[in-house]
Amino acid sequence: EELLGRARASAPRVSFVDNTFSRLLRELLSTLNPFNRVIFEKRLNGAVAIVPFEEALHGILLPLQEQVGQLWHDNHIDVAVEHYVTKHIQQKIFSAMNQLPVAEFGAKVVVACPPGEEHDIAALTVAYRCRVRGCRVYYLGANVPVASLANLCGKVEPDLTILSFPLALSDDKATELVQALANEVSPASNLAVGGHGAIAMRDLFVKYNITVLEDFAELDHKLDRLMRQSSSRA
């Protein structure tokens, strides 16, 4: 899962002792095999409710997604269980986003996953962090065709478009996609990419003047600059 491991390193330190989150994660994972829906939901809901969401996001939700993905990869849980956990994590992030005020001013940011990419937890996390900082966010989610992305950017004229790449593409597919982004999206918006795949394809992105974000700390720095620029134009 893209950016998830890096997110923990770049996130603010949580106020709870790390062992508390580690113990909770072990308890949550223990409910997945054998699968116990009631205990899983009670523990997850209870934990997220009692800490600030930023701490819950980086101390519980992102590590949980990362570890569940690894369990599925190692054939310790079924893909249906992995999807179940992922949907709960998505719901938590969407719920937190919906409690934030709708920005009428500030930098405009489009967040999406490229064509064929269905894993959107990291992209959703990016959208949340943009919302927290007062950006006007257009979150498009998974598997967005380049033509559709370009069409939207042409209409809303964003200050920045961020794409989430969890995995590197083959050389041919990467070249085709990056050229399409440069030709169709870049004329309407500055482009940035993040994730393990983006970092692996760094040279190709740099060749086409597309910014590669190393982690969430670098994202936050870029967003702060955008918001200052937006304020100065107001």
Which residues make up each language-model segment?
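Long amphipathic alpha-helical segments
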Residues: 1-101
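C-terminal regulatory/effector modules of DNA-binding transcriptional regulators
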Residues: 75-234
